[in-house]
């Protein structure tokens, strides 16, 4: 019985050592595979970097300055280069010069066809509803007229909204008056409006005082 138990214990210890050796071998193989994979990745990265550098600088520097000049037409001394007189012996490249422009001749301005700018201004004014008279000069004119009527001792003061309302009404009146004046000029087979056209338009409107 003692002999059998010793044999069984020896088998168990032998099996344990063999399993441990197999585990160590597997671990070593795994480490080797990881190391090879890392080396492959590093090699690929270096190759990509080298390819990127070659793409960024496609011109490969030559060994000497004379060979650089013969290949690429450049001459540049670098540390260790032999100074030669190749560049001085070769003729210089001539640059093409632009013809001189005579500055004394005035530049001709672009001329539009008659009526083009007028139609552009008409479209611009028809699209907008902004005030066409400057606000400050109009306000000064309103204050001046009011002072002429009531005198400076009265102390008349104006609100900005009141002056704005007067300006809106004044511009609307002038626009409609000029529209009627233009119709009177067209009726007279003319293009230019005159004072008599304004007088006729105001007389047709029934306004008593005439310009």
Curated annotation (Swiss-Prot):
UniProt keyword list: Centromere, Chromosome, DNA-binding, Nucleosome core, Nucleus, Ubl conjugation
The keyword Ubl conjugation is annotated on this UniProt entry: yes
Annotated GO biological process: mitotic sister chromatid segregation
Ranges for region Disordered: 1-63
InterPro entries (alphabetical): Histone-fold, Histone_H2A/H2B/H3, Histone_H3/CENP-A
GO CC term, one of those recorded: chromosome, centromeric region
GO molecular function: centromeric DNA binding; protein heterodimerization activity; structural constituent of chromatin
SUPFAM superfamilies: Histone-fold
Residue ranges, annotated region (H3-like): 104-207
Post-translational modification, as annotated: Ubiquitinated. Is degraded through ubiquitin-mediated proteolysis when not protected by its association to the kinetochore.
Location in the cell: Nucleus; Chromosome, Centromere
Bias type Basic and acidic residues, positions: 23-36
UniProt biased composition (Low complexity): 1-18, 37-56
PANTHER family membership: HISTONE H3
Function of the protein: Histone H3-like nucleosomal protein that is specifically found in centromeric nucleosomes. Replaces conventional H3 in the nucleosome core of centromeric chromatin that serves as an assembly site for the inner kinetochore. Required for recruitment and assembly of kinetochore proteins, mitotic progression and chromosome segregation. May serve as an epigenetic mark that propagates centromere identity through replication and cell division.
Family: Belongs to the histone H3 family.
Protein name: Histone H3-like centromeric protein CSE4
Organism name: Candida albicans (strain SC5314 / ATCC MYA-2876)
